């Protein structure tokens, strides 16, 4: 029987959560920016919930969701454009120099 039943330790070859997050951030840096943008927009819109005036709550929440999704989609599009630039334009210019 194990002494620490409630604790799970990853195998030696696997990364822990913080190392994996940092590695994924280096591979695609705009994903955390998109997530942070969604959280900031959602927090701001929920904070402004009191000052919504005569707008229904459901409409306010729908607008909040649309704004957060727009931020996430924008980050995804910027990430895709950066990846295309890195893989095609930058690589082609480096190959032409050699």
UniProtKB/Swiss-Prot annotation:
PANTHER family: HIG1 DOMAIN FAMILY MEMBER 1B, HYPOXIA-INDUCBILE GENE 1 HIG1 -RELATED. This is HIG1 domain family member 1B. Residues 1-28, 84-98 are cytoplasmic. It is found in: Membrane. One of its GO terms (cellular component) is membrane. Residues 47-60 are extracellular. The keyword Transmembrane applies. The lineage of its organism: Eukaryota, Metazoa, Chordata, Craniata, Vertebrata. Keywords: Membrane, Transmembrane, Transmembrane helix. Gene3D superfamilies: 6.10.140.1320. Residues 1-94 form the HIG1 domain. The chain crosses the membrane at residues 29-46, 61-83. InterPro entries: Hypoxia_induced_domain, RCF1. It is a multi-pass membrane protein.
């Amino acid at each position: 029987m194990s002494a620490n039943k409630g604790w799970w330790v990853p195998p030696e070859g696997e990364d822990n959560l913080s190392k994996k997050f940092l590695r994924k951030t280096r591979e695609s840096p705009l994903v955390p920016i998109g997530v942070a943008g969604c959280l900031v927009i959602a927090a701001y819109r929920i904070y402004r919930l009191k000052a919504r005036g005569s707008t229904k709550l459901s409409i306010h929440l729908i607008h909040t969701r649309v704004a957060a999704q727009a931020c996430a989609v924008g980050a995804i599009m910027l990430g895709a454009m950066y990846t295309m630039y890195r893989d095609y334009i930058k690589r082609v210019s480096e190959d032409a120099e050699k």
